[in-house]
Amino acid sequence: MTKGKVDALLGIVFGDEGKGKVVDVFTPRYDIVARFAGGPNAGHTIIFEGKKFVLRSIPSGIFDEGKLNIIGNGCVIAPDLFAAEAHELESAGYDLKSRLHISKRAHLILPTHRVLDRAYEAAKGKNKVGTTGKGIGPTYIEKASRTGLRVGDILNDFPQKYEALKARHMQILEDLHFTDFDITEEEKRWMEGVEYMRQFPLTDTEIELNKALSEGKNVLAEGAQGTMLDIDHGTYPFVSSSNTVCGGVCTGLGIAPNRIGEVYGIFKAYSTRVGAGPFPVELFDKTGDLIREIGHEYGAVTGRNRRCGWLDLVALKYAIMVNGVTQLIMMKSDVLDGFDSISVCTAYEKDGVQTTDMPYDTEGWKAVYETLPGWKTNLTQMTSEEEFPQQLRDYIAYIEKETSTPITIVSVGPDRAQTIIRK
C-alpha cells in the first residue's frame, strides 16, 4: 500500500460478490472508506459481531469508530431509506454522526422518482430491464439533464425547489397515464429523512478527500454492483445508471487518476446475475438450483432469486482489462465444496463462431466450457491456504494463469474470520 492513494474495491462481474465483507476486513488498513456511485438499489451484507447488517447507502467502514466514511458526489440518496438504515445502525450502538460525511453534490431520490421508475418500466412492456424500482434511473436522468436536486439544496430554499420538481414529475406521470398511486405517507417519511440528514456533516467531500490524500492518508473506494452493470461497459441496456468501473472512482469522488493505487477486483468462484439481461453461463438445471440454494443467492435489497452459473472467464478478463485490476479476490469458494467437477466458461460461441473477447451484444451467445475436478472438501473451517486441497489450489492457479492476475484473498465463508489472505 502506498500512502496518499485511493485503492478501489470493485465488483467485476454482475455484483453481489460480498464487497461489504471485504471492506470490513480491509477497513483497519485505511483512514477513509468512500462510496462513489449508485444508491439504495445495491445492498452490501456484513456480519459483524454475530449480527447481520445490509448497508445500501452507508459505506461498510462505518463499524470502525476510528474511520471516516464518505458518501461521494457520484452517489444518489433517498433520505427516507438513508434514515431507516442509519437508525438501525444507531440502535445497535454505532455513532454515525461522528463517522459519516455526505457530499453536497450527491443527488436526491424523490418519492416521485420511484413512481417514475415504475411507470417507465411498465411502459416498456416485454422489454423491461428489471429495475429495482428504487428511483435510481430517473434520478440519474435528471442529473444528466441538469434538473435534479442535490443534497446541498436542502440547506437553502428547499421546499420551493422540491415542490417545483415534484410538479414536473406529476405532469410526466399524467402524460404517461400512470396516476394510480398515493405517496402521502412515503412523502412524510421522506421529509423526516431530509430533516435527519441535516444533522450530518454535509460537506464538499472532494476537497476533504484531496486534503486527506495530500496528508498521506489512505482511502478505500467501495464500489457498488459490478462492471457488467456499468452504464458504458456493461450489458446495455440491462445495466445500472452509473459508472461502476474504476473510472467512476475519479468522477464519483472528485479525485485525479494519478491518485489511484491498487485496484482490487472481487468475484465469486461461480457466476450470478439479478434481473433481466443476457447471461451466457446461466444454468437452468438442478446444478443452478443447487448453487443458488447453497450460496443463498437472493438479492439483499429485492429478495429476488439470483440467476446462477459457472465462472465466466470472458466476462472476468474483460472486467480486469477495463478496470486495470491489480489483485483479485475470490469469494464464496465454499459454495462449490460438494461438486465432483467444476466447469469454467473459456469462450462464447454463436453461429459456429467462437470468441474469447466480450461481444458488443452477448444476447444469443452460448458458453464454451472447460471442466476441472472439484475439491469435495469442507473449506469453511480452514484458516490458511496451506490447508487448501490440491484441486482448489489448481482452480486458483488456473484462473490466475488465464487472467494474468494474482488472487490474493480467498473467502471460505460469510464471516470476516473466514477470509484467507494468501502469501
Explain the meaning of each model-derived region.
Residues 1-423:
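Non-transmembrane, aqueous-exposed alpha-helical and coiled segments at domain scale
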